[in-house]
């Protein structure tokens, strides 16, 4: 696949950009992806007889994860409108506490009801986004971001939690490999904001990530700070390559790096390949 047509117009400033430099809102492709993913997740839970199934490597059940997706997606619709919704402090710990409080208050666990609410909320995000001025900035738990980045956040969030549900119910991943470029705006926005300070202390390294043939990007760790770009700023110390879907799920900790490597789905190379084993632990992905 030619990654130029998929990625080169994604600006690191949180805006979609054409090669001619004109900023445009490429929301149609993002909307199709988000609504498709939401529909697939809804299909996993709509007729599920036991919503109390535990999710592997998670404290949540399927019902709790589906409830989280339903109310969080509705929250994103309100954020797209420009409303500020206090919800944690952007840290993994703060968001975990906010999620726990929200799940106590939002008690719906019926799969059919949650499926309908999730699909409706995903549509609502884009209804709100279309009604906003092009320079709309949206307050979110991860900071204030352009509405285009919020839409990318939605695709990422649905893919991450939807895939966790898929591991519990034995369903296919709800997102496609071609959805990865649509997540780039949020990935570039959030990764510099969520490093584990203790883990990156004293580390200077450049990681090149190759998500199949759909997205190449890089994460640079220098002096306690992280930057993200579509190309490495210097020769990479470690190249992490693999199946686009599985590598994404490793980064967001739905799957483990060790398991993906053992299965042959991810490979590490470069001058310091073992650095790749540390990559997921360098970030507190919320």
Mark where each language-model region is.
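Helix-loop segments that flank and shape redox-cofactor active sites
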Residues: 40-61, 82-87, 128-146
